[in-house]
Amino acid sequence: MSDITSTAKSAHASKMVLIVDDDPFSLELFSEMLMSLGVTDIHTASNGRVGLRTLTDLPRQPNCLICDVFMPDMDGIEFLEALTKNGYQGGIILVSGQDISMMAIAQEVAVADGLKMIGAYTKPVPIAVLAEALASLD
């Protein structure tokens, strides 16, 4: 086990993370990466609307949301605006495998709305980058 994952495991054990992404492969990959970092309370949603329903069903707010910018039905920007209206207080990691400029716009929207941006990354996100982003929540 690498130093990154062995150190991170105990630090992230109590964190809850919600992953919102329309790509099943990305949902699985992020889930596996989070588990390898010690996060065990992981929830997934296939788009922003499902993500909002999941948030209301959870017993508490997740410490972190990992959100794809480009999704059908409700994209990442609409999802971020809804998070603001719902008073979400946790950290947000934006991810995209597509246009970086849209991710920058989404990040600006989140910051302007008072959301706690942890970072914005292109897919695939290296596990060391994800570990560092989660560590910034502490």
Regions found by a protein language model. Give the residues of each.
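Alpha4 helix (beta4-alpha4-beta5 surface) of REC/receiver domains from two-component response regulators
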Residues: 78, 85, 89, 98-120
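Active-site residues of response regulator receiver
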Residues: 21, 68
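Receiver (REC) domain active-site loop signature in two-component systems and cognate sites
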Residues: 71
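Two-component/phosphorelay signaling modules centered on CheY-like receiver
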Residues: 24-43
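Non-catalytic signal-transmission and effector/linker regions of two-component phosphorelay proteins
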Residues: 1-18, 31, 116, 126-138
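A Lys-centered signature of the CheY-like receiver
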Residues: 123
